[in-house]
Amino acid sequence: MESALSRTPATGPKAGSGLRDPALYLNRELSWLDFNERVLELAEDPAQPVLERLKFLSIFTSNLDEFFMVRVAGVQEKIESRSDRCGPDGLSPTHLMDAIAATVRALDRRHARQLSEVLTPTLSHAGIRIVGCAQSGIPADTFERYFREHIFPTLTPLAIGPGRPFPYISNLSLSLLVHLRDRGGDAEMYARVKVPKEVLPRFVTIEPGTFIPLEDLIAHHLEALFPGTEVISHSLFRVTRDADFEVSDEADDLLAAVESELRRRRFGEVVRLEVGSGADPGMRARLVEWLDVAPNQVFDVDGLLDLSDLRQVAEIDGHAELRQQPWTPQTHPAFRPLVTEAGEQPDIFAAMRESEILVHYPYQSFSSSVERLVLQAAEDPDVLAIKVTVYRTSDDSALVPALISAAEAGKQAVCMVELKARFSERQNIRWSRELEEVGAHVVHGVPGLKTHAKTILVVRREHKEVRHYVMIGTGNFHAKNARLYEDFGFFTTSREIGQEVNNLFNSLTGYAHPQREPKVLTAPDAMRGPLLELIDRTIAAHRAGAPARIRLKMNALVDPACIRALYRASQAGVPIELNVRGICCLRPGVPGVSETITVVSIVGRFLEHSRVFSFQLGAERAMYIGSADLMPRNLDARVELMVPIEREDLRAELDDTLDRCFADDTNAWTLQPDGRWERRRGGTRSVHDELMARALTAAGSTDLD
C-alpha cells in the first residue's frame, strides 16, 4: 500500500535547510499506520497458522481503535482550533487527516477481504464456521428460543423522533439503526438498538464450532422488539470517540480528578463513524447528520464491524494444529532452586548477591524472577522496605498483593502508581485504594510528568549493613503481557545503582529534584543530553580511526534532536543499525545524510518491546537498557530510567540478541529511503524461534512443548 505523502524520493536536504528539511522526516501518524499494516501482513501471511492469522486481524482492529481515540483525536483537535502548525515532516493537520483517511480506507478493505475471502473459508474447512443465521443451517426455532431466553432481555430499543432526540452512543459500542413504518399508517420512524456485546459474547455458539455474530441474531428478530411496526431496513454502525484527556496537576485530589475525567471520556467528540457497507444511503446520511461528522470521518466497512472480537474465535478450545506451538517461559538458570525438593523456592537474594542477572521475557520467566523478588521480599523479616513503580499491571499479578502483605507485616511499602497511564487508569485507581487501606505509602508522581520508569527497590538489613536489591526493566510489571511482550529485566545489588534508584524514588515521593547521576540515565532532566553526548563521542571515535558503531533497539524513533544527531553520525561515516518496531520518523539511505543507517522492524509472534542502546566508542563500550523510547514525550514529559550494562557476559547476551534481530529474514521489514517498508522474504531465520531455542539451551532443555 502506498501513500503519496510518505513515499517520496530520497534526496538530500534543500540548500540552506540543513538537517531540519521536512523531506528528511517521515510523518509520525503515517508511520504508525505503516506499523499496523505490518500487523495486517501477518494476518495475510499463509505461512502463519490460521488461528494466529485471525488473532492478528483482531490486534489490527484494536490497534486502529486506539489510534483513532488518541492520535486522530489530537489531529482533529488541531483542525478545529484552526492550528496550521506542522510537524518536522511539514504536513499540515488538514492534509494529514486526509492522508490518514485515505490510508485507513485502503487498509480496511484489505482487512475485510482477508476475513471474508481467505480466513473464513479456511476456517470452515477446519470445522470452524463464522456465519450468519441464514447460512448456519440451524433451525429457525432454535434461534428463536435462544433469542427469547438469552438476548431479548438485555435489549433496549430507543426511539428517535419528535421529543426523542438521537441517543448518546458510547465509545466503540456496536449499534443497529432501524428504519420502521407504522403498520396502521404511513408514518416512518427510526430507532437505535445497542448490540450488548459488553454483557454477551459477540459470537454466539449455539452449536459447537459455529460462531454467529450477535448483531445478526438481533437483526433476524427485530420485529419482536417493535410489535405493530414494519421493519423497512436496518444498518450496523459503530462510533469511536476522543478518549484522550488531561488532568490538571494542580488538582487537590489527583485520584478524584482522574475518576472525573474517566467519566467525561465517555462523552468525547466523535472521531470516526463506521457504517456497514450495505447501509441504505438515507440511513447513512441521517447518521452523519445526527453525529455531526465530516466526510473524512466516515468509513464504510465491508462485512463485519469491529473485528477485535475475533479474538473470541481465535481462542476456541482445541485445534492445536491451527496454532503456533505453545511456549513456556523458562526459569533463568540463576533463579533455579539449589535444592530440588518439592516446593523448594530459590533464594533470589542469594542469586543477586552472586552476580548481576539479565532476564529476557517472554523467553525466560517473569513469575520466577520479578514476582519472586517481591514475594520473597514481602515474606523476609530482614527486609525493611519495598519500593515499586506501577505503570500497568494485571489482575493476576502477584506484585500488588505482595506489597499489601508487606505493608500488613509492618514493612515500608512504597508504590508509585501512575494514575494517568492511558486505558489503565481504573485498575490503577483500584490498586491505589487497596494499598492505601493497608497503610502502604502510595504516591502518584511528579506534577506535569507521567512516571514510566520500571523499577523495584528492596532494602534489606544484612548483619550490620543495609543492602539495596534493584530490578530495572524495559517493560511493565504485567504478568499476562510478560508472556507476550519481549522485554529485559536487570537485577543488581550494585551500591551505586541502588543509591541512584533510591534518589529517583525520593524525587517521586518528596521534594528532591531529579539530578544527573553517575550511572543511570533519568528523563526528563538527564537522558536526551547524555545520549546526544554518546552519539557525538561515537562520531569523534570514528573520525580518530577507532572502532565506532551505534546499535539501537526501541519501539519508536520520533525525537527530532536524536534523529538529527544520528544523521550527523551517518554523515561522519558511523555505521548505524536501528531496530524500531513501530513508528520511525528517520529516513534512512538518503544520499549525503543517512547512507550508513539501516532500519529494521520485527513484527511477529511476540511484541518487540525492549529498549537497548549500544555505542562503540573506540576501545570503550556504552550499553543501556530501560523504559524510554526516543520520543519527545519520553524524553521531556515522562520520568524514565535507563541503566548501564557493564558486565561483559551480559553485554554479549544483548549483542547476540541484536545480531539475531538484524539477521531475521522471516519476521523483519526494512525501511527504504522512500519511506516504504519492504518485508524480507524467503528466509529461514526467526529471532523469536532462535531466542526460544537459546532459552531452552540455557535451561538445559530442548523441548519446545
What does each of the following model-derived ranges do?
Residues 555:
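Cofactor-pocket helix-loop regions in the catalytic cores of large enzyme subunits
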